[in-house]
C-alpha cells in the first residue's frame, strides 16, 4: 500500500511543469467594430478593452497594442520589468517603459500599452524585448523575432 502511494506521488511530481518566470500575451485592437465573424475570444477582448469608452474619440484613444506580462520571481527580491520597443515611425530609436514590482509578492501581471496618439503618430510596434530583473540582475527575458 505504501509502495503504491509512493509511486503515485512520484508520477504526480513528474507530471508537474516548471513555472515560467516570464510570459507575454499580445493583443492589437485595430478597430472599434465588433464583428460576428470575429472569434468569440477576440470579441470578448475587444469589449474588455473598449469598456467604459463612451464617445467615438474615447474609443479611438483605446486603439493600439497591448502587452500583458505575467511574471514569477522571488518574493523577497527587488523586482522590475523593463519593456523596450521600436515603433514604425521612430526608426531605429529604442523606447523604454519600466515598472517596479512590489516586494513581497512572488507573481503578478503588469500591462504595457501603446495606444491612442502614441500609436497613431509613431506607428505600430515592430520589435520588442521584455526583461524581468531581480536585485539588478536579469532573471528572464523574452523578445520578438525582429528584435536585434
Protein language model features and the residues they cover:
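Extended, low-complexity, turn-rich repeat/linker tracts enriched in Gly/Pro/Ser/Thr and Asp/Glu
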Residues: 73-77, 120
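Short glycine/proline/serine/threonine-rich loop/turn segments at secondary-structure transition edges
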Residues: 119-125
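Extended low-complexity, serine/threonine- and proline-enriched intrinsically disordered segments
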Residues: 77-95, 130-132
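Short proline/glycine- and polar residue-rich coil/turn motifs
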Residues: 100-108
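Short beta-strand elements
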Residues: 138-148
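Contiguous beta-strand segments within globular domains
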Residues: 38-73, 109-114
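Bacterial Sec signal peptide processing site at the extreme N-terminus
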Residues: 15-32
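Sec-dependent bacterial lipoprotein signal peptides
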Residues: 1-16
Amino acid at each position: 500500500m505504501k509502495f503504491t502511494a509512493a509511486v503515485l506521488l512520484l508520477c504526480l511530481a513528474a507530471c508537474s511543469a516548471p513555472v515560467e518566470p516570464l510570459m507575454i500575451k499580445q493583443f492589437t485592437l485595430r478597430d472599434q467594430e465588433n464583428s460576428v465573424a470575429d472569434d468569440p475570444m477576440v470579441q470578448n477582448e475587444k469589449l474588455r478593452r473598449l469598456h467604459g469608452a463612451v464617445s467615438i474619440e474615447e474609443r479611438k484613444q483605446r486603439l493600439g497594442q497591448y502587452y500583458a506580462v505575467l511574471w514569477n520571481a522571488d518574493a523577497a527580491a527587488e523586482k522590475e520589468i523593463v519593456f523596450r520597443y521600436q515603433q514604425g515611425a521612430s526608426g531605429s530609436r529604442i523606447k523604454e517603459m519600466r515598472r517596479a514590482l512590489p516586494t513581497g509578492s512572488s507573481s503578478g501581471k503588469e500591462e504595457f500599452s501603446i495606444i491612442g496618439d502614441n500609436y497613431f503618430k509613431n506607428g505600430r510596434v515592430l520589435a520588442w524585448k521584455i526583461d524581468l530583473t531581480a536585485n539588478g540582475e536579469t532573471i528572464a527575458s523574452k523578445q520578438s523575432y525582429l528584435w536585434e
